[in-house]
């Protein structure tokens, strides 16, 4: 058994406390290096068998043993980890930590290798593989023999995650130092991959599960709990008799496959089928048992805190608790969480840069659960029942309440024409698409295409407008794309004078999908000799970029035009055009066009203004030639195309993302809104591709909230002051650099108190570091953020005061408080203001000393100040019970005493 003097021994006997971490690493190394699948399987099975054998010897006479293979499994499949919080560490941060902890010269060869791990060096083919590069840097500096056990590694990783959550960087470094000083270079290579959550084993998690136990994958699908899988299925000879959906246990939802419009009748077995609108919200499952509710996202993350655990809290549960039929004790419902606008009586779409995941009580929009399936009713499990029967049961579960809980409307059909009519109607309504479902289908967790199909306009050739864009920039790839350009920055041309060629190009989007590795390689060869490093300090004058900058650029005359297909054009300040494309994909290289024949700004504006930016501008008509035709209102004819599913949309299915890297391994995000070319769902898909996890509402494990465009929900999240709210630009930079980019003030929309305190010590309010050198380009960027606002918002004043420790100033003693003064005869009727009372003076004092005084008693108020008249206090307390955040009711003495002493007095002694 390996020893580690710096760590406390485990109080309980476990296999993990006896197994050297080196044994696990050597097994992983053998699995990765061998080529054949049987060999890989054998190495893992041998390790697993030895673990189980030792387990039997260790616990032979014990009962109710909870020790299992979980400590090893969570390291082998780190992307499925749910218990441990985010590490907050990716490649670049690891590189900086290694440079610091190993005392490497910052400009030295090894430090440069670590920091620029994605840049090809011409030596080994390790470009983009940080763990391999780190291995060769660490090899001469690391101990020859490791001293850690599997259990100790997990304890140190727990410490890193916990200290990252507590924003304690010092303790994070301390734990990392213990890992470094007690691990060999080989062990650290695998530690890095575990932290980044991309082991690159060349074997799928499905294979790992199947070797562990025949029922493992199925149990994980209905529980999303790796520890439960390892504990319940420790004995490979014991089978689960009933692996099924359980109340209050998150399951992976059933998914839809892409439909072939031409074959839809055959795919539905030439029988009657259902057509539903495909909702553009967040997939959510609701579990209810009496007054207890739980909500889970499609990835098994818990959003109960946001939507409500009981009838008295959350943005949804209080409004729907009473709509359930009296005989319903418990149930599990599957559906889509949407944002509903009661004024227009419409649902918000993701393209509107709105995200339901973080919405709380809101004056403009409200949470609405659109239910399309029921999986349990009064302890009766229904997954094995047909969809038609489940629909009948669903109709008797609750009474729909407009804007709060709906049953998704369906209609029966049996012909292709009815499907096409429904799709055309969805196009006209600017909806995402339609669903087609087999009435006889049963519910199969995590299965795709088992009777459920989806059709979106972008899946059908001929229905979307394509854009001919010029490649002007590139980004180095990582992993299998290491050493080549894997993503491209595309641009449109400034409209030239007649018969002139364009000279200036504006960036519009970054694209990284739609092509095979061979196509990417061929394109790379074509452009290879023309790439030049992009210098942020001295960018090319003919390529204008927004905040999204390429790593390399190419002169327009040496580049090629690519045909891009996308869902829609959306606003974005990341690109020079102030807009970008949602779900862009390269269809083909336009070999028939010269570089100067790309789309112009005028053409872009025409597309952008039409159909609210949607690029699905045509109706689908099936005639004898099966060709799509233009809508009648269109006047410019297009070339007719054969109808079918575009090939590039078959592989990258956004609703079933395949992991391509471990950049965000163990990092939990809450994406509220998208930006530019990246919609909310695209950002979530990219996060999933990078190994991260996405929740619909933030919780204690959420690393940060990603925001592209601010809205009412974002403001409510900021008002809660619990989470770090970060611009989507930061996420895009992470994607661009293939690592977790350290936060800078420019990325932050709102900071939690801990983060704000950290930033106040290192940056000024415009993002200029107190200690790091600043170049001209960075300084210009800082200056661009200095706004000449005549009136500074109170929250910004409060942030500045806190950041620079000005909050001890006597003029800001009430800063950060939103206060309602009780000088209105009727609550929430400003026209009934009572004049000539002392409270009018108190209100002036509150404003003078930094408070925000409001005329309405609503969500967000922190204090209510009462004078001599207490007649309205009872009504205020009744209102307070309905609020998510409770306000304090204090006497006016709290104001006068605080002003007198120059500090905010504790409200306790002034409460009413």
Swiss-Prot record:
Interacts with XRCC4; the LIG4-XRCC4 subcomplex has a 1:2 stoichiometry. Component of the core long-range non-homologous end joining (NHEJ) complex (also named DNA-PK complex) composed of PRKDC, LIG4, XRCC4, XRCC6/Ku70, XRCC5/Ku86 and NHEJ1/XLF. Additional component of the NHEJ complex includes PAXX. Following autophosphorylation, PRKDC dissociates from DNA, leading to formation of the short-range NHEJ complex, composed of LIG4, XRCC4, XRCC6/Ku70, XRCC5/Ku86 and NHEJ1/XLF. The lineage of its organism: Eukaryota, Metazoa, Chordata, Craniata, Vertebrata. Belongs to the ATP-dependent DNA ligase family. NCBIfam families: dnl1. ATP binds at residues 276-279, 283, 336, 350, 372, 432, 437, 454, 456. Keywords: ATP-binding, Cell cycle, Cell division, DNA damage, DNA recombination, DNA repair, Ligase, Magnesium, Metal-binding, Nucleotide-binding, Nucleus, Repeat. The active site is at 278 (n6-amp-lysine intermediate). It is an enzyme of class 6 (ligase). GO terms for molecular function: ATP binding; DNA binding; DNA ligase (ATP) activity; metal ion binding. The gene is LIG4. Mg(2+) 1 binds at residue 336. Residues 615-625 are annotated as: Required for catalytic activity. The keyword Cell division applies. It comes from Gallus gallus. It holds the Pfam family DNA_ligase_A_N. The keyword Protease does not apply. Its main location: nucleus. DNA ligase involved in DNA non-homologous end joining (NHEJ); required for double-strand break (DSB) repair and V(D)J recombination. Catalyzes the NHEJ ligation step of the broken DNA during DSB repair by resealing the DNA breaks after the gap filling is completed. Joins single-strand breaks in a double-stranded polydeoxynucleotide in an ATP-dependent reaction. LIG4 is mechanistically flexible: it can ligate nicks as well as compatible DNA overhangs alone, while in the presence of XRCC4, it can ligate ends with 2-nucleotides (nt) microhomology and 1-nt gaps. Its cofactor is Mg(2+). This is DNA ligase 4. Its EC number is 6.5.1.1.
């Amino acid at each position: 058994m390996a020893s580690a003097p710096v760590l406390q021994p485990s109080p309980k006997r476990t296999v993990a406390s006896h197994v050297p971490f080196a044994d696990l690493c050597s097994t992983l190394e053998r699995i990765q290096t061998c080529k054949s699948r049987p060999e890989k399987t054998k190495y893992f099975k041998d390790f697993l068998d030895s673990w189980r054998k030792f387990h039997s010897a260790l616990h032979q006479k014990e009962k109710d043993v909870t020790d299992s293979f979980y400590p090893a499994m969570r390291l082998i499949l780190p992307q499925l980890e749910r218990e441990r919080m985010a590490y907050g560490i990716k490649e670049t941060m690891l590189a900086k930590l290694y440079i610091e902890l190993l005392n490497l010269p910052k400009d030295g060869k090894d430090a440069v290798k670590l920091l620029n791990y994605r840049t090809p060096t011409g030596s080994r083919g390790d470009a983009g593989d940080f763990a391999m590069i780190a291995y060769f840097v660490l090899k001469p500096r690391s101990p020859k023999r490791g001293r850690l056990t599997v259990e100790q590694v997990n304890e140190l990783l727990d410490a890193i995650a916990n200290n990252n959550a507590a924003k304690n960087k010092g303790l994070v470094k301390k734990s990392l130092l213990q890992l470094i000083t007690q691990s060999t270079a080989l062990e650290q290579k695998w530690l890095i991959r575990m932290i980044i959550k991309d082991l690159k084993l060349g074997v799928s998690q499905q294979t790992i599960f199947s070797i562990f136990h025949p029922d493992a994958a199925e149990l994980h699908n209905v529980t999303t709990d790796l520890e439960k899988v390892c504990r319940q299925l420790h004995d490979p000879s014991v089978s689960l008799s009933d692996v099924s959906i359980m109340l209050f246990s998150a399951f992976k939802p059933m998914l839809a496959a892409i439909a072939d419009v031409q074959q839809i009748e055959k795919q539905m077995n030439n029988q009657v089928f259902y057509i539903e609108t495909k909702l553009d919200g967040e997939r959510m499952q609701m579990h209810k048992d009496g007054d207890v509710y739980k909500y889970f996202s499609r990835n098994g993350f818990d959003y109960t805190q946001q939507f409500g655990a009981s009838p008295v809290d959350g943005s949804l549960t209080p409004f729907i608790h009473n709509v359930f039929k009296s005989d319903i004790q418990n149930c599990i419902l599957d559906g889509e969480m949407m944002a509903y606008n009661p004024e227009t009586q419409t649902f918000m779409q993701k393209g509107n840069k709105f995200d339901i995941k973080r919405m709380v009580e809101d004056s403009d929009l409200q949470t609405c659960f659109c239910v399309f399936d029921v999986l349990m009713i009064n302890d009766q499990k229904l997954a094995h029942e047909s969809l038609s029967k489940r629909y009948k049961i669903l109709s008797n579960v609750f009474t729909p309440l407009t804007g709060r809980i709906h049953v998704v409307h369906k209609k029966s059909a049996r012909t292709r024409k009815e499907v096409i009519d429904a799709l055309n109607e969805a196009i006209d309504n600017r909806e995402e698409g339609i669903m087609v479902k087999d009435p006889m289908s049963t519910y199969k967790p995590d299965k795709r295409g088992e009777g459920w199909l989806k059709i979106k306009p972008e899946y059908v050739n001929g229905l979307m407008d394509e854009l001919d864009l010029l490649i002007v920039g590139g980004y180095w790839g990582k992993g299998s794309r290491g050493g080549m350009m894997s993503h491209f920055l595309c641009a449109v041309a400034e409209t030239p004078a007649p018969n002139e060629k364009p000279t200036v190009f504006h960036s519009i989007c970054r694209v990284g999908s739609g092509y095979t590795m061979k196509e990417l390689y061929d394109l790379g060869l074509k452009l290879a000799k023309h790439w030049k490093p992009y210098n942020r300090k001295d960018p090319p004058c003919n390529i204008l970029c927004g905040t999204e900058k390429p790593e390399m650029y190419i002169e327009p005359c040496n580049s090629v035009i690519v045909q891009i297909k996308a869902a829609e054009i959306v606003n974005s300040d990341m690109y020079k055009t102030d807009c970008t494309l949602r779900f862009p994909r390269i269809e083909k290289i336009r070999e028939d066009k010269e570089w100067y024949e790309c789309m112009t700004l005028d053409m872009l504006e025409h597309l952008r203004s039409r159909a609210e930016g949607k690029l699905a501008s045509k109706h689908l008509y099936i005639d004898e030639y099966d060709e799509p035709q233009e809508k009648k209102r269109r006047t410019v004819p297009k070339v007719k195309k054969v109808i079918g599913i575009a090939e590039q949309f078959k592989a990258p299915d956004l609703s079933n993302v395949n992991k391509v890297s471990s950049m965000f391994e163990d990092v939990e995000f809450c994406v509220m809104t998208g930006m530019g070319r990246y919609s909310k769902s695209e950002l979530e898909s990219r996060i999933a591709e990078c190994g991260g996890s996405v929740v619909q509402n933030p919780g204690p494990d959420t690393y940060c909230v990603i925001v592209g465009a601010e809205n009412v929900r974002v403001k409510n999240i900021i008002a809660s002051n619990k989470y770090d709210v970060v611009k989507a630009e930061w996420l895009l930079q992470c994607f661009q650099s293939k690592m977790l980019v350290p936060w800078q003030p420019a990325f932050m929309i709102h900071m939690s108190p801990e983060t704000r305190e950290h930033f106040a010590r290192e940056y000024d309010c415009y993002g200029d570091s107190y200690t790091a050198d600043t170049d001209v380009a960075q300084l210009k960027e800082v200056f661009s953020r200095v706004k000449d606002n005549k009136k500074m918002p109170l929250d910004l004043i409060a942030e500045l005061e806190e950041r620079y420790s000005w909050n001890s100033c006597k003029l800001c003693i009430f800063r950060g408080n939103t206060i309602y003064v009780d000088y209105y005869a009727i609550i929430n009727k400003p026209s009934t203001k009572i004049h000539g009372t002392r409270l009018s003076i108190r209100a002036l004092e509150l404003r003078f000393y930094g408070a925000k005084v409001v005329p309405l008693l609503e969500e967000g108020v922190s204090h209510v100040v009462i004078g001599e008249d207490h007649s309205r206090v009872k009504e205020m307390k009744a209102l307070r019970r309905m609020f998510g955040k409770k306000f304090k009711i204090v006497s006016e003495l709290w104001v006068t005493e605080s002003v007198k002493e120059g500090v905010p007095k504790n409200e306790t002694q002034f409460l009413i």
